[in-house]
Amino acid sequence: MRRLILFLLALTLLPIFRMPASAQMSNMPEDLRARLAEINPTWGKDILGNVATTLALYTPLLAAAPKDGVRIERDLAYGPDALHRLDLHKQEGRTGMPIVVFLHGGAYVRGSRSVNTEVYGNVATYFARQSMLGVNGTYRLAPAAQWPAAAQDVGLLVKWLKANASAHGGDPERIYLIGHSAGATHIATYLYHSDLQEPNGAGIAGVVLMSGRYHFDPKPDDPNLTNFQAYFGTDLTRYPAQSPINYVKAAKPMPTFIVISEYDNPDLDTQGALLFGALCERDRACPRFTRMELHNHLSMVYQFNTADDALGRQILEFIRRGR
């Protein structure tokens, strides 16, 4: 049945998948394009090694990227834990700005909002340069924190922004959450598990979910199986109740943008397709969907605030249109 669903989804998404790479990445430097073409075909064989290589490619590009006019307020606490921290990226003197929150990945057990001086501040800086309030946050990690702790942290962060964002020029009625990998899973869990929300709802205006996991059925050869189990546990009978996708039908509609990369971590591309299909079925209208051609699981995030801003422009349009 799952193969049939994926086949039908593939037919639906074929026009997107056939979009020429030049249409998505016309501003990518040729030398970077060439290096990614070398790295990407081996992505799943050495994920951590390829992450390090990709980071080394992008860090100097991001160091040279424009940041003029963006001020950063660092290490603000949105909750009681040491990992309940966020940085605000903004232009001074602006009010009523849409708020764009980025939550990093890290296979549930690692990750930080500051991998180095450039990543992942590049995401919040990009949106600050577009006259928005950029938020770069982190959350609790396994094994110290287990499901649904990180999704609860998403709720804490939203609650903090509701109370404090206006003092920093943000509009608390226009909060958009962007999550990558594990960060996308935590946002989806918060969005679709209504018991994790305030009584009046999620309190957000839209979500961008980048290569997350939404249906929990990990395979024995999944390279992140041990990390997955550290957060979600080893009891397979609990996975259906934990899976965000199983709550889509009952959830309130929310503007959603699903993103995957051409060279993604095993199963995360099909996870995006499954969520896309579930939302199409529920809403009788499909959400925005993009596959980032020639990008891998990390370059899809590292590219923010570089000359290759195709995804950034799509997110800006998503925010403007509300879909």
PLM region spans:
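Mobile cap/lid helix-loop segments that gate and shape the active-site cleft of serine hydrolases
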Residues: 62-65, 212-247
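Short amphipathic alpha-helix adjacent to the substrate-entry channel of hydrolases
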Residues: 114-135
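C-terminal catalytic histidine-bearing segment of alpha/beta-hydrolase fold enzymes
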Residues: 259, 270-276, 280-323
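Acidic catalytic loop of the alpha/beta-hydrolase fold
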Residues: 216, 263-267
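Primarily recognizes the serine-hydrolase "nucleophile elbow" in alpha/beta-hydrolase
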Residues: 156-222
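Short beta-strand element of the alpha/beta-hydrolase
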Residues: 96-107
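Short beta-strand/loop motif that positions the catalytic acidic residue
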Residues: 251, 258-261
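N-terminal cap/lid segment of alpha/beta-hydrolase-fold proteins
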Residues: 33-94
